[in-house]
Protein backbone atom coordinates (compact mmCIF):
# COMPACT_ATOMS: atom_id res chain seq x y z
CA UNK A 1 0.00 0.00 0.00
CA UNK A 2 1.11 3.58 -0.61
CA UNK A 3 0.49 6.08 2.18
CA UNK A 4 1.40 8.89 -0.24
CA UNK A 5 3.33 10.52 2.63
CA UNK A 6 -0.05 11.60 4.00
CA UNK A 7 -0.54 11.08 7.77
CA UNK A 8 -4.31 10.56 7.49
CA UNK A 9 -3.83 7.96 4.76
CA UNK A 10 -1.06 6.26 6.77
CA UNK A 11 -3.41 5.89 9.75
CA UNK A 12 -6.16 4.51 7.49
CA UNK A 13 -3.79 1.99 5.96
CA UNK A 14 -2.53 0.92 9.40
CA UNK A 15 -6.15 0.30 10.39
CA UNK A 16 -6.69 -1.73 7.20
CA UNK A 17 -3.50 -3.77 7.61
CA UNK A 18 -4.47 -4.70 11.15
CA UNK A 19 -8.24 -5.17 10.90
CA UNK A 20 -8.55 -6.62 7.39
CA UNK A 21 -5.16 -8.07 6.49
CA UNK A 22 -4.57 -9.35 10.02
CA UNK A 23 -0.90 -8.35 10.29
CA UNK A 24 0.68 -9.24 13.64
CA UNK A 25 3.37 -6.54 13.64
CA UNK A 26 4.28 -3.54 11.53
CA UNK A 27 7.44 -1.91 10.30
CA UNK A 28 7.05 1.83 10.70
CA UNK A 29 6.83 4.36 7.87
CA UNK A 30 9.31 7.02 6.85
CA UNK A 31 9.09 10.19 8.95
CA UNK A 32 7.99 11.26 12.38
CA UNK A 33 4.73 12.67 11.02
CA UNK A 34 3.58 9.37 9.54
CA UNK A 35 4.73 7.44 12.60
CA UNK A 36 2.75 9.83 14.85
CA UNK A 37 -0.35 9.14 12.77
CA UNK A 38 0.03 5.36 12.85
CA UNK A 39 1.11 4.84 16.47
CA UNK A 40 -2.35 5.40 18.01
CA UNK A 41 -3.77 2.80 15.62
CA UNK A 42 -1.19 0.15 16.48
CA UNK A 43 -1.67 0.94 20.18
CA UNK A 44 -5.43 0.57 19.88
CA UNK A 45 -5.01 -2.96 18.53
CA UNK A 46 -1.95 -3.94 20.58
CA UNK A 47 0.10 -4.52 17.43
CA UNK A 48 3.85 -3.88 17.79
CA UNK A 49 5.33 -1.34 15.40
CA UNK A 50 9.11 -1.28 14.94
CA UNK A 51 10.15 1.97 13.35
CA UNK A 52 13.46 3.27 12.13
CA UNK A 53 12.54 6.63 10.65
CA UNK A 54 10.42 8.46 13.20
CA UNK A 55 12.75 10.23 15.58
CA UNK A 56 10.61 13.03 17.00
CA UNK A 57 10.94 13.14 20.78
CA UNK A 58 7.17 13.40 21.17
CA UNK A 59 6.82 9.83 19.87
CA UNK A 60 8.63 8.61 22.96
CA UNK A 61 6.80 10.69 25.56
CA UNK A 62 3.27 9.44 24.89
CA UNK A 63 3.66 6.19 26.83
CA UNK A 64 3.14 3.93 23.83
CA UNK A 65 3.57 0.27 24.79
CA UNK A 66 3.74 -1.13 21.26
CA UNK A 67 6.07 1.36 19.56
CA UNK A 68 9.71 0.34 19.33
CA UNK A 69 12.50 2.40 17.82
CA UNK A 70 15.88 1.37 16.49
CA UNK A 71 17.37 4.86 16.47
CA UNK A 72 17.97 7.64 18.95
CA UNK A 73 15.34 10.35 19.33
CA UNK A 74 15.99 13.51 17.33
CA UNK A 75 16.91 15.61 20.37
CA UNK A 76 20.04 13.46 20.74
CA UNK A 77 21.17 13.61 17.09
CA UNK A 78 23.54 16.57 17.24
CA UNK A 79 24.03 17.44 20.91
CA UNK A 80 27.38 15.65 20.73
CA UNK A 81 28.62 18.34 18.33
CA UNK A 82 28.28 20.98 21.04
CA UNK A 83 29.84 18.73 23.67
CA UNK A 84 32.75 17.90 21.35
CA UNK A 85 33.33 21.57 20.51
CA UNK A 86 33.43 22.41 24.23
CA UNK A 87 35.85 19.55 24.86
CA UNK A 88 38.10 20.78 22.03
CA UNK A 89 37.87 24.28 23.53
CA UNK A 90 39.43 23.12 26.79
CA UNK A 91 36.09 22.66 28.53
CA UNK A 92 35.01 26.26 27.99
CA UNK A 93 31.64 27.11 26.44
CA UNK A 94 31.45 27.88 22.73
CA UNK A 95 29.38 30.20 20.53
CA UNK A 96 26.67 28.33 18.63
CA UNK A 97 24.77 29.41 15.52
CA UNK A 98 21.62 27.43 14.75
CA UNK A 99 19.27 27.29 11.77
CA UNK A 100 16.33 24.88 11.76
CA UNK A 101 13.37 24.06 9.57
CA UNK A 102 10.00 24.32 11.28
CA UNK A 103 9.02 20.63 11.20
CA UNK A 104 8.69 18.38 14.27
CA UNK A 105 11.95 16.51 13.66
CA UNK A 106 14.09 19.63 13.20
CA UNK A 107 12.51 21.32 16.21
CA UNK A 108 13.35 18.28 18.34
CA UNK A 109 16.95 18.46 17.12
CA UNK A 110 16.88 22.16 18.10
CA UNK A 111 15.67 21.32 21.62
CA UNK A 112 18.58 18.91 22.01
CA UNK A 113 21.02 21.62 20.93
CA UNK A 114 19.48 24.11 23.36
CA UNK A 115 19.85 21.54 26.16
CA UNK A 116 23.51 20.97 25.21
CA UNK A 117 24.18 24.72 25.10
CA UNK A 118 22.78 25.13 28.60
CA UNK A 119 24.54 22.02 29.93
CA UNK A 120 27.95 23.11 28.62
CA UNK A 121 27.76 26.81 29.46
CA UNK A 122 27.84 27.70 25.77
CA UNK A 123 26.14 30.66 24.11
CA UNK A 124 23.52 30.77 21.36
CA UNK A 125 24.43 33.59 18.97
CA UNK A 126 22.06 32.82 16.07
CA UNK A 127 18.73 30.96 16.18
CA UNK A 128 17.19 31.18 12.71
CA UNK A 129 14.00 29.61 11.40
CA UNK A 130 14.33 28.08 7.96
CA UNK A 131 11.46 27.64 5.50
CA UNK A 132 10.26 24.12 4.74
CA UNK A 133 11.39 24.33 1.12
CA UNK A 134 14.84 25.69 1.84
CA UNK A 135 16.35 27.21 -1.30
CA UNK A 136 18.52 29.97 0.15
CA UNK A 137 20.47 30.27 3.40
CA UNK A 138 22.35 33.43 2.49
CA UNK A 139 20.74 35.59 5.20
CA UNK A 140 21.74 33.13 7.91
CA UNK A 141 25.23 32.67 6.48
CA UNK A 142 25.84 36.44 6.36
CA UNK A 143 25.09 36.49 10.10
CA UNK A 144 27.42 33.52 10.62
CA UNK A 145 30.24 35.41 8.91
CA UNK A 146 29.57 38.43 11.15
CA UNK A 147 29.11 36.57 14.47
CA UNK A 148 31.93 34.04 13.93
CA UNK A 149 30.44 31.14 15.93
CA UNK A 150 32.48 28.11 16.91
CA UNK A 151 29.72 25.75 15.73
CA UNK A 152 27.02 26.02 13.06
CA UNK A 153 24.12 23.57 13.40
CA UNK A 154 21.65 23.18 10.53
CA UNK A 155 18.63 20.88 10.40
CA UNK A 156 16.98 21.00 7.04
CA UNK A 157 16.86 17.43 5.77
CA UNK A 158 18.53 16.48 2.49
CA UNK A 159 17.63 19.55 0.43
CA UNK A 160 18.48 21.91 3.27
CA UNK A 161 21.80 20.22 3.93
CA UNK A 162 22.77 20.35 0.26
CA UNK A 163 21.75 24.01 0.04
CA UNK A 164 23.75 24.82 3.17
CA UNK A 165 26.88 23.02 1.97
CA UNK A 166 26.71 24.67 -1.45
CA UNK A 167 26.19 28.17 -0.06
CA UNK A 168 28.80 27.78 2.69
CA UNK A 169 31.33 27.02 -0.04
CA UNK A 170 30.09 29.75 -2.41
CA UNK A 171 30.09 32.39 0.33
CA UNK A 172 33.40 31.17 1.77
CA UNK A 173 31.93 30.84 5.27
CA UNK A 174 34.63 29.74 7.69
CA UNK A 175 33.22 28.01 10.75
CA UNK A 176 35.34 25.62 12.86
CA UNK A 177 32.58 23.01 13.24
CA UNK A 178 29.52 22.25 11.14
CA UNK A 179 26.82 19.78 12.21
CA UNK A 180 23.79 18.89 10.06
CA UNK A 181 20.85 16.57 9.75
Which positions does each model-derived feature cover?
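Extracellular/periplasmic Venus flytrap/periplasmic-binding protein
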Residues: 57-58, 65-172
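Short hydrophobic/aromatic-enriched beta-strand-loop microsegments
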Residues: 46-53, 121-125, 173-180
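Alpha/beta-hydrolase-fold catalytic nucleophile elbow
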Residues: 155, 180-181
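Short active-site oxyanion
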Residues: 23-26, 149-152, 174-177
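Cofactor-binding loop segments of dinucleotide-utilizing enzymes, especially the Rossmann-like FAD-
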Residues: 3, 101, 180
Amino acid sequence: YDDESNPKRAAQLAERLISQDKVEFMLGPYSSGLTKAMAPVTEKYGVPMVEANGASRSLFTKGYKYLFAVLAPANLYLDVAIKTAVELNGGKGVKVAMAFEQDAFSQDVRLGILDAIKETGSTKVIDDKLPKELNDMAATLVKVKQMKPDVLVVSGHTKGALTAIRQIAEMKVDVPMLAMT
